[in-house]
């Protein structure tokens, strides 16, 4: 049986769950088999995941344990959402996280290259551009 630790943390509302596993100071998150197993018993409406690199086809990450945990999050979500810095488009990393078309929504800080945008639209992926509002 997997124990899910329920903890209230400072935020604007909702709940936060600390799933356990091996804590990484580098990524400020938990990873490993315990984390992946705990995610496997959950179902989320939406999962927001980030990636440090993406090319025309996929999102990538340089750490295997991060990829496994993020893949588990995507599998447990009804609406997988990728958040990516537009400057990271056109780059790859060692591990393939997911095909870009597997995400229902992609949020970037700048428009994606037209060829990628067209392919994602064909696949039914919504692309949103995040911006700061002027005060």
Functional labels for PLM-detected ranges:
Residues 3-135:
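Conserved phosphate- and dinucleotide-binding cores of soluble alpha/beta proteins
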